């Protein structure tokens, strides 16, 4: 029987595990070469036991929760299978560094390279230290829509990047030869390896201090405690079957063809089952994700609803959760489905799970949120030396849904991306031929309600040199819904401005291989969150604050909230407002009539005229 430490020592071990993953994270931030790692923080680090169970995941990208543990387990199986079949000694040893970017293991795209170091104590394999991080380039097409995984870049199977402490030069040379900016790739590679090695050293130091038995017993106790907390929260949800449906705009290939998102949640005592069987089949465009991502979005929703503040995130967090996800769904795609923009659809699955459970636990869910990274992929040649530059020029925050008792958060990264950050304006302008003209809140974008949805943002980026522009923005048509009478938030938008005046909005958020010339600008507008509760019940003092801060306009205050102003002032006439609110209960103004209109929609003729310049530039650039 496993011997467990006393509660005090268990808490010391708990905090030791959290400290290890936080130090791994800090180490990677300070040594990585790519801005998407050291600024945007598109990575996650973690510790796993000898069977691949999650021990501690660093605060980072929640969507990597399942992918990392699944990858570690598959690595264990892989080397066991090879050793058994070939009857040779090719197992896992001290000094090994394992690596893969297999999209169908991680559930994400090929840019996510995962490095894993085995941890040994007294000659036995006891744990793993791992890091999954986004490389800016992994080969493959730069622009346009990919139709299969083979066009998206290098696929690295499970191999050893280091064998018993010695570098595998074949692997390292292969990477250098096949990426566009090898010095950056090798810098990020070495940063990840340093981070996972540090995690292994710190874990061994924890064992040296408290003993292997105490550390393993402490980990088991932590998992059991986390499980008990989660089960307690599930028991508080009324038993039943809860369903909800939403959609994605399209897959980027069949324009305008909606992609169904349907979830069924079953609660029975202290167990929850999330069934994604009726989610749409995998699609032609690159918006598919693997099974690990489909299950991760269920885990993200479950963690939010049961134990959002419990640290570290570990295997016990999800023991009360069953997930039904057949292969071949858009979030359980199989080879060779393209997966470059893997992260987009799972965000709406999380939203839809909350929507399904809203009737059962209205006090624990939020309305719909903007649910997209609003990322633009840019590439061009530097005017001064002709060198290629690449940038994911987005990661802007939007509005989160309101909840019972609180307005939604504004300018916040979407739920599945957790601790990722937007890159500082100063860094972007210093490193790339871009000028950020504006990055601010979007007035009137939050859905009206007793509690108002968070505001989206607007980012205007002017070209200081020619470059190619690609946007992969979703939820333009599927707006963040409100709950219990709350209005929807505004949708996401993508626009361009050619010259100083003319701005036109794309009818879709999916814009591929469009050339912008010096002086042109692209504009990303993140949607606002949905409101919660009827707008006519919003306290007038909150509306006054919103007006003062510029969050809403007079038009929104009058139309959605039934406000009457005194004369030509911004002072609210309280008595007149109460009378008007009573009248509006029976004849409310439709929310769509009050949406902000930032720009005209681009016609097909407009687009043809604006983007006839790209062919010669493509030849120069790529």
Report the location of each language-model feature.
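Glycine/proline-enriched, intrinsically flexible loops and inter-domain linkers
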Residues: 1-121, 125-622
């Amino acid at each position: 029987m496993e011997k467990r430490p006393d509660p005090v020592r268990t808490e010391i071990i708990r905090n030791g595990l959290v400290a290890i993953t936080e130090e791994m994270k800090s180490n990677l931030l300070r040594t990585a070469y790519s801005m998407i790692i050291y600024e945007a923080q598109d990575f996650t680090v973690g510790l796993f036991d000898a069977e691949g169970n999650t021990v501690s995941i660093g605060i980072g990208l929640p969507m990597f929760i399942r992918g990392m543990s699944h990858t570690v387990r598959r690595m264990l199986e892989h080397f066991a299978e090879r050793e058994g079949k070939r009857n040779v000694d090719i197992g896992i040893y001290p000094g090994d560094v394992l690596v893969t970017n297999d999209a169908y293991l991680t559930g994400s795209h090929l840019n996510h390279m995962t490095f894993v170091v085995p941890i040994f104590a007294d000659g036995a394999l006891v744990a793993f230290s791992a890091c999954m991080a986004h490389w800016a380039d992994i080969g493959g097409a730069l622009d346009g829509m990919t139709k299969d995984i083979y066009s998206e870049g290098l696929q690295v199977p499970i191999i050893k990047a280091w064998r018993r402490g010695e570098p595998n030069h074949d692997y390292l040379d292969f990477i250098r030869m096949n990426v566009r900016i090898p010095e950056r790739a090798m810098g990020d590679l070495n940063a990840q390896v340093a981070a996972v090695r540090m995690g292994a050293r710190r874990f061994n130091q924890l064992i040296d201090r408290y003993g292997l038995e105490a550390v393993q017993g402490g980990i088991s106790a932590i998992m059991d405690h986390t499980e008990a907390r989660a089960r307690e929260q599930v028991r508080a949800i009324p038993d039943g079957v809860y369903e909800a449906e939403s959609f994605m705009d399209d897959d980027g290939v069949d324009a305008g063809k909606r992609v169904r998102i349907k979830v069924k949640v079953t609660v029975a005592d202290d167990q929850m089952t999330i069934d994604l069987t009726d989610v749409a089949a995998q699609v032609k465009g690159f918006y598919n994700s693997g099974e690990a991502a489909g299950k991760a979005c269920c885990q993200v929703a479950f963690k939010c609803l049961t134990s959002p503040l419990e640290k570290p995130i570990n295997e016990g967090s999800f023991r009360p959760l069953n997930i039904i996800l057949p292969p071949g769904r858009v979030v359980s795609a199989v080879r060779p489905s393209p997966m470059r923009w893997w992260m987009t659809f799972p965000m709406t699955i999380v939203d839809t799970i909350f929507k399904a459970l809203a009737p059962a636990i209205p006090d624990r869910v939020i309305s719909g949120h903007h649910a997209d990274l609003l990322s633009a992929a840019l590439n061009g040649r530097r005017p001064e030396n002709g060198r290629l530059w690449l940038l994911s020029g987005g990661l802007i925050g939007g509005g989160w849904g309101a909840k019972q008792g609180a307005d939604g958060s504004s300018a916040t990264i979407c739920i599945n991306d957790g601790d990722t950050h937007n890159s500082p304006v100063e860094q972007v302008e210093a490193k790339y031929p871009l000028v950020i003209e504006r990055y601010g809140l979007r007035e009137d974008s939050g859905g009206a309600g007793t509690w108002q949805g968070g505001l989206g943002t607007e980012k205007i980026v002017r070209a200081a040199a020619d470059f190619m522009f690609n946007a992969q923005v979703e939820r333009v048509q599927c707006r963040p819904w409100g709950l219990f009478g709350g209005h929807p938030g505004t949708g996401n938008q993508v626009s361009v401005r050619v010259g100083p005046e003319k701005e036109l909005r794309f009818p879709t958020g999916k814009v591929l291989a469009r050339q912008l010339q010096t002086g042109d600008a692209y504009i990303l507008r993140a949607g606002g969150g949905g409101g919660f509760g009827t707008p006519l019940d919003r306290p007038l003092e909150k509306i006054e604050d919103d007006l003062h801060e510029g969050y809403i306009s007079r038009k929104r205050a009058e139309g959605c909230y039934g406000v009457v102003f005194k004369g030509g002032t911004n002072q609210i006439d309280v008595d007149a407002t109460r009378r008007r609110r009573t009248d509006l209960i029976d004849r409310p103004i439709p929310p769509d009539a009050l949406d902000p209109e930032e720009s005209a929609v681009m016609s097909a003729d407009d687009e043809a005229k604006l983007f006839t310049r790209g062919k010669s530039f493509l030849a120069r650039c790529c």
